A protein has these predicted regions:
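Short, glycine-/small- and polar/acidic-enriched structural segments
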Residues: 33-169, 174-177, 193
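Sec/Tat-exported extracytoplasmic proteins
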Residues: 67-68, 91, 96-99, 107, ...
């Protein structure tokens, strides 16, 4: 899941985010070519620092290199919208840690993406935080206030959902588009009075004069906040063994957390730049999905034929409807999100 988004046509084109598409860091690791990666060329994998979650274990422990071999390049992005240009260009065949709105924005512009791994559902690690000094007592109280978020990220959907339920017209709210690091700074300087954000910034705000007004546990499962991993459909269909190895590497991170929890907390804390205590709190705020969970009705569906009725596909549709109503995207909601969800690489 990331920090503030303006609700009016913030991601009407992928090109709008070109200015923030530069990755923060690139890690290149060469490994012996595996059967999966032969003829696939150099493989780029994008990811975000979402705090403590199993995918950061896969990055830190080099599971992608172990499973995929060959030349794997890891690119760190500040947010999902920041990765859109790379995804749209086809230069980034895999991306992890995305919220649904950036994926929807890309798909709406014709980028051939499929969700191939649903990492986790947010329950307590993302939401709406207000300053205790702001006087904001309810979602309706955001009227006339400055709210920070990452435009085009999951935060847009969350805020739109909270506002709709509270009867709040978002045109009455001053929305400030910031990256997660900028949001943290804006909070400290008093530029914003509230924010919709995810970990690790979410925890920072709560512990620095903030109060949780709403969290993602208030969202229904069919319209909830997930961290998801996507693959370029064209690339994955040409190199299915690579896609399966990508999913396997993500599963390795989940298994490490399940089997070596104490060590895993240390790995996640170091990789995310947080304390072990914070990592422990953050990981408790997720419902985490393993590889075996993927091909189930609640996650990606049992097959391509049933993916449209899966929890992930239904949440994609509900996110899409909310973003369309809010004017964040201009492409109408499709009848089915089944074509954008693929459980087969997890089998």
């Amino acid at each position: 899941m990331h920090v503030i988004r303006r609700m009016t046509r913030v991601v009407s084109t992928v090109a709008m985010v070109a200015g923030i598409a530069t990755p923060m860091a690139v890690e290149a690791v060469r490994a012996t070519p595996s059967a999966a990666s032969v003829n696939a060329g150099s493989i780029a994998i994008g990811y975000e620092n979402n705090g403590a979650d199993p995918s950061i274990i896969s990055v830190a422990n080099k599971y992608f290199q172990r499973e995929m071999g060959h030349d794997v390049r890891l690119k760190l992005f500040t947010s999902g919208p920041a990765a859109l240009t790379s995804l749209a260009s086809g230069q980034l065949p895999f991306m992890c840690g995305l919220g649904m709105p950036p994926v929807i924005a890309a798909i709406a512009q014709g980028v051939p993406l499929q969700v191939v791994f649903n990492q986790e559902r947010y329950t307590k690690d993302a939401g709406l935080v207000v300053k205790t000094s702001s006087g904001i007592k309810s979602v309706a109280g955001l009227a006339g206030k400055s709210v920070g978020l990452v435009i085009g990220s999951q935060s847009s959907f969350e805020l739109a959902t909270y506002a709709r339920k509270a009867g709040l017209n978002l045109s009455s709210v001053r929305l400030v588009n910031l990256t997660p690091p900028e949001l943290q700074s804006a909070w400290a300087t008093g530029r914003i009075e509230a924010a919709v954000v995810w970990d690790p910034v979410y925890d920072f705000l709560v512990t620095h004069g903030g109060r949780v007004l709403m969290d993602d546990s208030k969202l229904p499962v069919t319209a909830t906040s997930f961290n998801i991993c996507v693959a370029n459909k064209s690339f994955a269909s040409k190199h299915p063994a690579v896609a399966r190895a990508f999913v396997k590497a993500l599963g390795d991170g989940v298994s490490y957390l399940q089997n070596h929890r104490t060590a895993a907390l240390g790995v996640m804390a170091k990789a995310a730049g947080i304390s072990v205590a914070t990592a422990k709190v953050e990981i408790a705020g997720y419902q985490i999905y393993s590889v075996s969970d993927q091909a189930t009705a609640a996650v990606l569906g049992t097959s391509s034929a049933t993916s449209a009725t899966s929890g992930t596909a239904q949440s994609l549709l509900n996110n899409w409807r909310a973003l369309y109503r809010a004017g964040t995207i201009t492409t109408r909601t499709p009848k089915s999100a089944g074509p954008f969800v693929n459980p087969n690489y997890a089998k």
